[in-house]
From Swiss-Prot:
The entry's keywords: ATP-binding, DNA-binding, Hydrolase, Mitochondrion, Nucleotide-binding, Protease, Serine protease
GO BP term (any one): chaperone-mediated protein complex assembly
Compositional bias per record (Low complexity), positions renumbered to this chain: 106-122
Binding-site list for ATP: G391, P392, P393, G394, T395, G396, K397, T398
Residue spans crossing the bilayer: none
Protein function: ATP-dependent serine protease that mediates the selective degradation of misfolded, unassembled or oxidatively damaged polypeptides as well as certain short-lived regulatory proteins in the mitochondrial matrix. May also have a chaperone function in the assembly of inner membrane protein complexes. Participates in the regulation of mitochondrial gene expression and in the maintenance of the integrity of the mitochondrial genome. Binds to mitochondrial DNA in a site-specific manner.
HAMAP family reported in the protein's UniProt record: lonm_euk
Native organism taxonomy: Eukaryota, Amoebozoa, Evosea, Eumycetozoa, Dictyostelia
Family under the similarity heading: Belongs to the peptidase S16 family.
Region: Disordered, residue numbers: 24-48, 99-122
Descriptive protein name: Lon protease homolog, mitochondrial 2
Length: 836
């Protein structure tokens, strides 16, 4: 066929385009390597003879022109396919050949239809593609003429405006390919003489989608087409302007940064030459040296490490990672208070005054602090010590630590270790890691700027183990007086003296602390508060504190003693007073709302209107069973424990069923008690074979609470005996103690807390093991007042006390003592705490 001079360009339909794009995606996905040859502007189809239904009928007859040694495909007239021609009509000049792909020859690649991308641009190529002779489809075409003439005034004005925009774009965007294409089109002869060719050449450069281009091709109004091309050209120019503005801003910003950098470097060099200023490295070195001289460390090992790090800092480049590591290390080294100590307060009377002002009671803790200061006064300096405060939540353990620091005149720092599982939090991270830093102990010393502070390690019983190590083992070095004089943090890697630090640890349960760690502490117990103590705490501390926080005066809101008693008795039975403060806060908040709304001017809280402010009663009764029944006995643990035994009528044989969220220890205690009670019942009544014939169900109410104690042995035996004999245990009687298979009553731990619990629950008679007699001396007299305490050695003693009236054991009765009572009033023997 030779080299063609015209090409008929038709867009494929939208549906065909989607199918074709899916094929291209699948081909690209199947290729393992990118194509070695660049993609051409023609797309090859292998679908056989084209189907006219898959292409648009209106297209363009492009003209191949030669300019400046290149072949350029320029826009030509718009044509429309009218139908398929017969094979014999070969001489018709209005026929266009649509070729078919033929794969039977090795050098033939047939192009049937051109698929434009988002914009159709003039194609510049040194060689015009040759279309091989093959099977083809002839179609009839005719010009797609405009419906109106192009000589109107509007058309002329639009044509002039379009030409002005073209030349403006060429001048403004000279370096862009868009301007180069416009420039090549302007050089063609058709640019100056044919409006249609001009529009058909400019339009493809400005389109944004194939549908927009097809709409441009099918337009029959010259005026409308001029408007479309002109608007597309203006939009194209706006996009270029926006891109150029962004590029200009980036260029200006980059130039400004470079200029600032060069000027800064020049200024540094000039100041250095004039001796006005030193460089950054010299400034930092001078700062570290001046700090180190003020510290005056005498340890040779520490001095050697400091010198080596300073030499390393001098040899490193300022932008290297080693430089930053050395600088951070030296910063920590020079900020620690190596030889800084605060002066301790040796005035014992003043210390006692501060402790009594902040806390009432706590006799053992106050005596320990006073003796601690007395020893330091004789020595001339107060050394370190490790104290463990054990008690229920809300009893003021943290506030005690703050009061001790205030009394001694030392700095105070609190470290919370609850849930801690990484040893590095205690001993620091090694410097090989990124963003490494010292542990919490060294950080605390840097914060307080002294080497003898009071450090409170809070919730030490809640430390956990993990794959990162055991923090409890790391604390051994911190808290051991023989080791903490040379405590080595992994980050510092030099010894630091912690021997003069007063460590105060807090815990709710000392049993969960490892024995080696517990052995290094002096354990002080803070028991729970009874009702009278809670009332005093509310009057003396909580009410004034909440008044200050809310701004409500005493004239606006008052409390009667009966209301405070009801609040403590029916709403706040916890061992601490934190929950009591929450209820008082709630009352004051509701009162503040009423004052702000003008609903009330002043209110007096009484037992009658208390529920309006705090809601329904939380604890309607302190006892689960108001009426005593056989098989029910009351025991003491962390709270009141009722052991309930009943006959299981629907189970055959002598069996025992247990319920109530019982732990392994308590289940073993039930087994021991059941084995013993069968033998003991035969001794009491040989004819009673109750346990040999019947099945028993033992239950501990409040099943949502886990129970795992060994101190309920005598309680379980008494419950089973009460069921078997039908006898009732004396009212207001609670018992605690572990029983053996021979009936021996074994001592238990936490007897002080259990007596306090009994006092809080208004229990009048208590049975405890004889082995726990010494622990009674630790309980203040005002707590033991009004309670009968029986000391028993064997269960036979328990039986005679609980079920008969012929017991030979006399109770320990703590009656009112005027002398002690006056002393208590003078010394205010009521434990209290500041809620913070």
């Amino acid at each position: 066929m030779g080299s063609p001079t015209h090409f008929g360009l038709f867009l494929i339909s939208d549906a065909e385009r989607e199918v074709h794009m899916e094929e291209l995606k699948s081909q690209e996905a199947s290729k393992s390597k990118p194509p070695s040859k660049p993609k051409s502007n023609f797309t090859t189809f292998s679908h056989g003879t084209p189907d006219l239904s898959k292409i648009h009928k209106v297209g363009m007859l492009a003209t191949v022109c030669r300019t400046q040694g290149y072949f350029v495909l320029g826009g030509g007239p718009i044509i429309e396919i009218t139908g398929v021609s017969n094979d014999h009509d070969n001489n018709n000049s209005n026929l266009v050949e649509i070729t078919e792909s033929k794969n039977d020859t090795s050098d033939s690649t047939t192009t049937t239809t051109t698929t434009p991308s988002t914009s159709i641009t003039p194609i510049t190529t040194p060689v015009v593609p040759q279309i091989p002779t093959s099977k083809y489809l002839k179609v009839s075409i005719e010009p797609h003429e405009y419906s109106e003439l192009g000589d109107s005034l509007t058309v002329r004005a639009l044509r002039l405006q379009l030409v002005k925009c073209i030349y403006s774009a060429i001048n403004r965007y000279q370096d862009s390919s868009f301007a180069q294409h416009l420039k090549q089109i302007c050089m063609l002869p058709i640019f100056k003489m044919d409006d249609s060719s001009l529009l058909n050449s400019i339009g493809p450069l400005c389109i944004s989608s194939p549908s927009e281009y097809q709409k441009l091709l099918e337009c029959k109004s010259l005026e409308e087409k001029l408007n479309m091309v002109l608007s597309m050209l203006v939009k194209k120019c706006e996009v270029f302007d926006f891109n150029f503005s962004i590029e200009k801003q980036l260029e200006e910003k980059t130039m400004a940064q470079q200029k600032k950098y060069f000027l800064t470097e020049q200024m540094k060099l000039i100041r250095k030459e004039l001796g006005i200023d030193l460089d950054e490295k010299e400034t930092i070195k001078n700062k570290f040296n001046s700090r180190w001289k003020e510290i005056a460390v005498m340890d040779k090992q520490i001095l050697q490490v400091f010198k080596e790090e300073m030499d390393k800092l001098s040899s490193c480049e300022s932008n290297s990672s080693e430089y930053n590591t050395s600088r951070n290390y030296l910063d920590w080294m020079t900020l620690l208070p190596w030889n800084v100590y605060t002066n301790d307060n040796f005035d014992i009377s003043k210390v006692k005054e501060i402790l009594d002002r902040d806390h009432y009671g706590l006799k053992d803790i106050k005596e320990m602090i006073q003796t601690f200061i007395a020893v330091g006064k004789l020595r001339g300096s107060i050394g370190g010590k490790v104290i463990l405060l054990v008690g229920p939540p809300g009893t003021g353990k943290t506030s005690v630590g703050k009061s001790i620091a205030n009394a001694l005149g030392r700095q105070f720092h609190r470290i919370s270790v609850g849930g801690l599982s990484d040893v590095s939090e205690i001993k620091g991270h090694r410097r090989t890691y990124v963003a490494s830093m010292p542990g919490k102990i060294i950080q605390a010393l840097k914060t307080v700027k002294t080497s003898n502070p009071v450090i409170l390690i809070d919730e030490i019983d809640k430390i956990s183990r993990s794959s990162q190590g055991d923090p409890n083992s790391a604390l051994l070095e911190v808290l051991d007086p023989q080791q903490n004089k040379n405590f080595v943090d992994y980050y510092l890697d030099v010894p630091y003296d912690l021997s003069r630090v007063l460590f105060i640890c807090t815990a709710n349960d000392a049993d969960s602390i490892p024995a080696p760690l517990l052995d290094r502490m002096e354990v002080m117990t803070l028991n729970g508060y009874i009702q009278s103590e809670q009332m005093e705490i509310a009057k003396r501390y909580l009410l004034p504190l909440v008044r200050k926080e809310t701004g409500i005066s005493e004239e606006q809101l008052q409390f009667t003693p009966e209301a405070i008693k009801k609040l403590c008795e029916l709403y706040c039975r916890e061992a601490g007073v934190r929950n009591l403060k929450k209820f008082i806060d709630k009352i004051f908040r509701k009162m503040a709302y009423k004052l702000s709304m003008g609903m009330e001017q002043s209110v007096i809280i009484t037992p009658d209107n208390l529920e309006q402010y705090v809601g329904p009663i939380k604890y309607p009764s302190s006892r689960l069973f108001q009426k005593q029944k056989p098989g029910i006995v009351m025991g003491l643990g962390g709270s009141l424990i009722h052991i309930e035994s009943a006959l299981d009528r629907f189970t055959n044989g002598p069996t025992v069923t247990t319920t109530g969220s019982l732990g392994l220890v308590m289940r073993e205690s039930i087994d021991i008690s059941y084995s013993y009670v069968k033998d003991f019942l035969l001794k009491v009544d040989a004819s009673n074979d109750y346990f040999l014939k019947n099945s028993i169900h033992i239950h501990a109410p409040d099943g949502s609470t886990q129970k795992d104690i060994s101190s309920a042995g005598i309680t379980i035996v008494s419950s089973l005996l009460s069921l078997a004999t039908g006898k009732l245990v004396k009212p207001d009687l609670a018992m605690v103690g572990e029983v053996s298979l021979t009936g021996k009553v074994i001592g238990v731990s936490g007897i002080v807390e259990k007596i306090v619990l009994a006092k809080r629950e208004s229990i009048k008679t208590i049975i405890i093991p004889k082995e726990n007699k010494k622990q009674l001396e630790e309980i203040p007299d005002f707590i033991k007042e009004g309670i009968e305490i029986y000391l028993v050695d064997y269960y036979s003693d328990v039986y005679s006390i609980a079920f008969t009236n012929d017991s030979t054991i006399k109770p320990l009765i703590f009656n009112d003592n005027k002398e002690n009572q006056n002393e208590n009033e003078n010394q205010s023997e009521v434990k209290s705490t500041i809620i913070q």
